[in-house]
Amino acid sequence: DLVDDVGRAYGFNDLEPRYPDIGTVGGRHDRSKLEDAVRTSLVGLGFEDLLDFHMISEAENYGRMGVEPGSDAVGGGDPVTITEPYSEDYTMLRTWALPSLVMVLENNTHRSYPQDVAEIGLAAAYDEAADTHVTEHRTVAAALARHDASYEDAKARLQALCADYDVDLETPATDHSSFIDGRAAEVVVDGESVGVVGELHPRVLVEHDLEVPVAAFEFRLDALA
């Protein structure tokens, strides 16, 4: 859009065409290739691929999920907020994608189950040490909403996904306020903690008017690179 505006102002007919001094070959970024591959794996595991907004409200990102802003929990990063938001529904960049998936489930309670949804998308948090004061990463999130959803279901699909990319997965027990005590684990890939897996806490389900159990996981995409 910017180049188009400059071209119109200068006059496209006044531009002198010339070949560039160097030759380049176009190609897709490795991250884009990885995203497509992981997306295909998720669909193969039975998930419906979603594309959601990267903007969210603080109430949805933290409050309704039971997460404390600024905490060390997955999704607890400090928010990157909008100074004058157009809508109170979109006041910040989301720090994790799971709240977006839970909102989709909330808006589809009138539909039949199971509902297994997943997304690969952007997450960001405020970081004073970063040059831009923002750190961004691509995240993989998935949720299983069904009458028999359990931690074991989510972990099994997580294991299958990681097996596709030949990475070493460990799931030590952890506490996370969005999940049931004793039914949550860290996602540790090749020795690094990159996410969480577990069953959503009943408080979160009630907050979103969900009447079936929901098991979910979320982790950093680059863990599979």
Q: What is each PLM-predicted segment?
A:
Residues D1-A225:
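Extended beta-strand-rich architecture
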